[in-house]
Structures are given as C-alpha cells and as structure tokens.
Amino acid sequence: MEIIIKALKKTFGDKTAVDIPDLTIHSGELLGLVGNNGAGKSTLFRLILDLIKADTGTVRMKGARSNGQGAGEHQQTPTNLLPLAPCPSPLEFDLNVATTEDWKDWTGAFVDESFLIDYLTPDEYFQFIARLTDTSDEQLQEFLARFQHFMADELAGQKKLIRTLSAGNKQKVGIMAAMLLHPQVLILDEPFNFLDPSSQNAIKHLLKKYNEETGATILVSSHNLQHTVDISSRIVLLEHGQVIKDIDNREHQAQSILENYFEIDD
C-alpha cells in the first residue's frame, strides 16, 4: 500500500506545522519519522489519518484489492492470525483519504490515548476490536499469544479498566489493538514512549516480523534514534514541517547521518 503526499500544507495561526511538496511512502516500507519537538511528526500522522484537515494538498492511498472484495478487505494477514483466502485477480485503487473512508478498513493506528475506550478492560477492548474484524475467539487467542512477552502478564486477565493502567500499559494496549486490525497500513506515533527496555525490544521485534510477514506499510515516529535505525528501511527527518533528509536505511547507514545532524557543538 503506497501513501502519496502532494503539496500538503497545514498551518496553525502563523506557524507552519507541515509543508511537504512531494513524498511517497512505498508499499512494504517500514518508515521511521524523526525530528525535534515541533518538527511536525504528529501533525503529519494526523493528516494522513484525516484526523485534521489540510490547508492545501492531498494524501492518497494507492494499492490493489482482490476482485470481488470490498475496498477495505485485506490481501494478506499475519501468519497464525487469520487464514489467507484465495486471491482473485487484483483491482487497483487510488483513494484520497479526505474524501472517502474506505482506506480505514485496512489501516491501523495508535497516536495517543484518545484512540482507546478507557472504560473497558484490555480483554474487553481486544474482544471489541476482534468483533469489528470478524476475528474468532480462537484467532484472538492466537494473536494474544504472540504478544505474551510484550504484555508481561500485566494486561490479559487482569480485570483492570484501561483508564487505571500505567502510561506504558496503555501504550501496549493501543499498539496491540492497532495490529489486531491486521492492517496493511500501520501508523504508530512514539510507540517506544513509556515502555521499559524489555517491552521496547519486544515491540521492535514484533513490528519487524509483522512487516516481513505481511508486506504492510508501517510508519513509526520516535525520538529514539537507535530504535528507529534498528527497525526502519527508510528514515525521513522533519524540521519545521519540512523534509530535511530522506535516508535509505536498508543497511543501517542512517545512524551516522542522524548523529551528525543532531550533534551538539561544544
């Protein structure tokens, strides 16, 4: 699934939050978005997800769906989550996210706590998401088993409302719910925030594996340069809403470039 950004601009008062003339995120990329506070990372994600309206420009999702399926039905799902259906001939589509909601069927995201239904327990929330995606109880349990180390015995079966959880555990619930949608586009804003080192390493492994298994397009923003370099095939550096650097990181060559950019002079 490609994400194609053209002439995208968003201002708040006299401040330009995003100003991107042309950016294409290619199908199957695991793209890391980095930049200082106020660089426009979260605003860009909100524009892609149509949570806020752009002043000018478009965000489009382009890909293919199987003949006879709805626009939002997925072509691939992760191993051990859902069985793959026979794949008829693909039909191409090109959707403007601001003018249709079809893209939401294959898009998972966690941007902040407002995405959660906090009067539910984690178990209830996952069951709710499972019903939305026609995921059986057996398939849900298989999904949760893949996240057992990530949950660290603090979420499943605990009967605690999401609103009472720590910031780190809320983060875990949001990430897992986004991935439970079996998305072909996955967008996570600061997924390493509030997580302990074990959980950070676990989610790095899970994201890389999900990308490899499904070919999903994954966008991750983070202030943690090391984690971003570890998982991303491509890294985009934003500053004042503009793309300053666009780095091929398939050989992890972005580390030195980013360290030099963010270096503090003595």
Label the predicted regions.
Residues 161-165:
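Conserved ABC ATPase signature
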Residues 186-190:
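Catalytic Walker B motif of ABC-type/P-loop ATPase nucleotide-binding domains
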Residues 49:
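Helix-to-loop junction immediately C-terminal to a conserved catalytic motif
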Residues 197-199:
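Helix N-cap at the start of a conserved alpha-helix in ABC-type nucleotide-binding domains
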Residues 221-223:
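H-loop/switch region of ABC-family ATPase nucleotide-binding domains
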Residues 34-36:
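The feature captures the beta-strand-to-loop junction immediately N-terminal to the Walker
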